[in-house]
Regions:
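Catalytic-site microenvironment of enzymes
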Residues: 1-242
Length: 242
């Protein structure tokens, strides 16, 4: 298992200039509701480590769009953009994967066994830090194509996870999807990482690959950058208010 960790700008402050520059690079200069960018957070030795997970990977492609674009690549692309934004802003960031791979233990045979090992190793990374905020990036799918929009899932295992989910939902509504009425949703053991993570954790379903219009957006580099910035803003809002 490879635990990928990058640490920069220890003790730095997320300045308004840096925050605005990241927003501009993502093509999102202003909050659509009130004309203001979300609150930035001051980085200190007590600031949580940000742990990012790109769902699926390797032989596990996740769901796919109608034209065959797999979820795993979209998840990873958003994660890499988000990691850069966070690191530029001074956060310490850990990722479960930064390539198209499963992180199961070597020597494990069989798809089911590899998947189980992969999830165990992701959870170990989530729980490796006593002070962390964990985000698992995914895409949604449904049998009917009309459904669209991001949705946040959290577990009651950590009492702060609900607040993180609300901050993330608020960020998506303010910055990217003003008409999104999807409520945050509490999960059970079926969402393994969320349920068993000891840190505040949210699974961000960024959109529906079963919706052709949203799938086309999610496959585009420009929209992925906007999604990454929206998640970045949700994290910053949560930490600033904690």
């Amino acid at each position: 298992m490879k635990n990928v960790k990058r640490m920069i700008f220890s003790g730095a402050v997320v300045s308004v200039c840096a925050f605005s520059a990241i927003a501009a690079a993502a093509g999102m200069n202003r909050n659509k509701n009130d004309g203001e960018l979300p609150a930035s957070a001051k980085i200190s030795k007590d600031t949580p480590v940000i742990v990012l997970d790109a769902g699926h990977g390797g032989i596990d492609g996740g769901c796919s769009s109608a034209d065959g674009v797999p979820e795993k690549g979209i998840n990873l692309s958003i994660l890499l953009k988000l990691r850069d934004m966070l690191e530029i802003s001074g956060y310490d960031v850990v990722v479960t994967r930064d390539t198209d791979t499963s992180i199961h233990d070597k020597g494990i045979e069989g798809i089911a066994q590899q998947k189980s090992s992969d999830m165990d190793n992701r959870l170990a990374i989530f729980n490796d830090n006593d002070n962390a905020v964990c985000i698992s990036i995914h895409q949604n799918q449904f049998t009917q194509p009309q459904y669209h929009g991001a949705q946040m899932f959290y577990s009651a295992t950590n009492p702060e996870s609900e607040s993180l989910a609300r901050a993330m939902k608020s960020s998506f509504t303010k910055l990217l999807q003003p008409d999104n009425q999807r409520e945050i949703k509490q999960c059970g053991k079926e969402l393994f990482l969320c349920y068993f993570s000891k840190n505040p954790t949210v699974m961000v379903e960024c959109g529906f690959l079963s919706n052709p219009e949203e799938a086309a957006l999610l496959a585009s580099d420009e929209y992925q950058a906007k999604v990454a910035f929206t998640i970045f803003s949700g994290i910053s809002e949560f930490i600033a208010s904690s």
